[in-house]
C-alpha cells in the first residue's frame, strides 16, 4: 500500500498525539502559588497561517492580559510541548483555552481563529 505524503503526515501526527496521550509525563508543572493568575493557553503550529493570524491577535490584546491572565504557548514544533496536546485532547489548531494556575481546564474556545472580542469573552469578567 502506497501512502501519499499528505496521508503519511496525518498518520505521523496521529501517532505522535497518541503517544503523547499515553505518556505518563504531563509536562512542566506550575509552581503552587496562592492567588496565581489563570492561564490563557494557545496551542499552535508556528508554520500554519491560521495560527500565525491568531498569534497576531493575541499580541494585539496582550496589554489587556496583564494582571488578568498569563499567556502560555504550546507549539507543535517543540518536542517538550507535545504531551500537552494529548493532555488537553487537542485535535484542531489554533486552539485557545483557559486553565487555572494548576492547569485544570476552565473554558475552551471552538478551534479556529478567535477575534479580540472572543478572546476577551473567553477570559471572562
Protein language model features and the residues they cover:
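C-terminal motif of bacterial Sec signal peptides marking the signal peptidase cleavage site
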Residues: 18-21
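Thiol-based oxidoreductase modules, predominantly thioredoxin-like and allied folds used
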Residues: 43, 67-81
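Structural micro-motif
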Residues: 88-98
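Bacterial N-terminal signal peptides that target proteins for export
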Residues: 2-12
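Bacterial signal peptide processing site
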Residues: 23-26
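Typically the conserved alpha-helix immediately C-terminal to a functionally engaged Cys/Sec
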Residues: 52-64
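Short active-site neighborhood of thiol/selenol oxidoreductases, capturing the structured segment around
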Residues: 34-47
Amino acid at each position: 500500500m502506497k501512502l501519499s505524503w499528505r496521508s503519511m503526515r496525518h498518520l505521523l501526527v496521529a501517532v505522535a498525539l497518541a503517544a503523547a496521550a499515553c505518556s505518563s509525563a504531563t509536562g512542566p508543572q506550575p509552581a503552587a502559588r496562592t492567588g496565581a493568575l489563570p492561564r490563557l493557553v494557545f496551542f499552535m503550529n508556528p508554520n500554519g497561517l491560521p495560527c500565525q493570524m491568531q498569534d497576531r491577535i493575541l499580541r494585539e490584546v496582550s496589554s489587556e492580559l496583564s494582571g488578568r491572565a498569563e499567556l502560555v504557548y504550546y507549539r507543535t514544533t517543540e518536542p517538550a510541548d507535545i504531551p500537552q496536546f494529548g493532555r488537553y485532547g487537542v485535535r484542531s489548531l489554533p486552539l485557545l483555552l483557559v486553565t487555572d494556575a494548576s492547569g485544570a481546564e476552565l473554558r475552551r474556545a471552538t478551534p479556529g481563529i478567535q477575534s479580540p472580542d472572543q478572546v476577551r469573552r473567553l477570559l471572562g469578567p
